[in-house]
Structures are given as structure tokens and as C-alpha cells.
Amino acid sequence: MLIREFRVVLPLTVEEYRVGQLYSVAKTSSQETSNGEGVEVLVNEPYKEPEHEGQYTHKIYHLGSRLPGWIRALIPSSALKLEEKAWNAYPYCKTVLKSPFLGEKFTFIIESRHAQDNCKTENIHNLSEKELKERTVEVIDITKPIKDPKNYKETEDPTKIRSEKANRGPLEEEKWRESTEMPIMTCYKLVTVEFKYFGFQTKVENFMMGIEFDLFTKFHRQVYCWLDEWFGMSMDDVRAFELKTKEDLKKKLEEKDENKAAEK
């Protein structure tokens, strides 16, 4: 089992990020869904529990060709999907990913907390002494170059983008966190991964953590660079955008079946 806390620093207020995160999740889901692969939203509704209340979502990720060949070799094509259940009681959020095929052999949990600070809270998740010893910490600076140059887009580079609506940016690499002219917040994302599969555990767990680093980096660069698209939106505006996106995703996932039918 691996436990890693990713700390993502952003030039936003915690309330601004609430809107920006939801908008960007919906937009990226739409961008990454086509021809039967991508995100299927089954449920998106309010929930209420004794400890938390917020928005509950249930999604299916149809992965298909998006996984490396060595992982696809482990499981049949019918099992190339992940089930995600998320409880967004902002500023606390919990996401659980499961593989219907792997069952109890695969555990993937993300717990997110958000604070108006500059990466200074050392145990925001209230971990035990044992958990703290097992946890590693990785700070993500959205201005640092992404690992794979092929994935670089100037329109998603915070050092190139200025938000006219928010009057922020472009961000100067590394030095922007010292600015007193912008708000500073941190997303503290605690990721727990366990893959109980003899001979592959270490490789898969490290692979998943690497994927999360890349996803968190890319996503939060987008959140900032799309500021002028979502800045000023209300929660009602975001929920309407999510609803429209849900319908669009359904159509895109149906494209593969329609294409197959046309080929017969």
C-alpha cells in the first residue's frame, strides 16, 4: 500500500476553487469522451449524512485503449472500466475508485481538503502517527513545466495566461507564490493505493501514483488557465453546466455503438 499527499498550490480563494473545480471536471470529461470511451455519469445529486452533506456523484470510466498495454494484458477487454463514487462536502471531498473485475484486490481512495494557506498545514487530514510515517508528500507547482513535452499546450500554461476577469497572471515560475497581490490556497489530496496482485503490486501502485501526479498537474493548470470561462459563475450556473455535460457525454458514449451498427 502507498499513501501519498499531493499539495497543489493555486492563486485562488477556496470559494473560487469550488466553482472552478466543478466547471473544469465537467469540461475535461467532455473533452476526453468520444467513440465509446471516456466518462459516463450515472448519478449527480445532493446527499446528506450525519457527518457531511453535499453532492454525490457516481461515474463509470470506460478506459479502453487509454491504458498501457501491460495493464490491458492483465485483464479482459470487458473489464477495462473503473467505477467512481464521490462525496463532495466541500471543502472536504472523498473519492473512491473501484474495478468491478479486480474487486477487493484494488483500493484507490482520494481524500481532499482545501485551505487558504501556502502549503503550510502539515497534518490537515488528521493522520495517526503510523499513517504519518507511511505518508510521503509531493508539492505540485502549476507553473513548473509538465513532464511530457508532447502534452504541452501554450493555452494551458499558467506562465503564459492572464485572467482579465480576475486580474491575475501570467504567473512567474516559482516566484508567484511569494506574491501578496493574489490569494493563495492549497488543495491537500491524500491518495491511498493498494493493488493486491502478486508480482505486480509495486509496479502498479507506483504507476498509479505517477498517473495521479500528472493528472493533478494537468487539471490544476487547466483550472487556472480557464479562469475567464468560469470566474463569476454561481453554483446554479455550474450545476446547469454539469447537467448539459451529462447529456453530451451520454451521446458521445453512444457513438461507438452507432458506428458498429453502421458497419454491419
UniProtKB/Swiss-Prot annotation:
It comes from Dictyostelium discoideum (Social amoeba). Catalyzes the transfer of PtdIns and phosphatidylcholine between membranes. GO terms for molecular function: phosphatidylcholine binding; phosphatidylcholine transporter activity; phosphatidylinositol binding; phosphatidylinositol transfer activity. Residues 151-174 are annotated as: Disordered. Pfam families: IP_trans. One of its GO terms (cellular component) is Golgi apparatus. CDD domains: SRPBCC_PITPNA-B_like (cd08888). Keywords: Coiled coil, Cytoplasm, Golgi apparatus, Lipid-binding, Phosphoprotein, Transport. Residues 238-264 form a coiled coil. Phosphorylated in response to activation of rasG. Its main location: cytoplasm. PANTHER family: PHOSPHATIDYLINOSITOL TRANSFER PROTEIN, VIBRATOR, ISOFORM B. This is Phosphatidylinositol transfer protein 1. It is found in: Cytoplasm; Golgi apparatus.
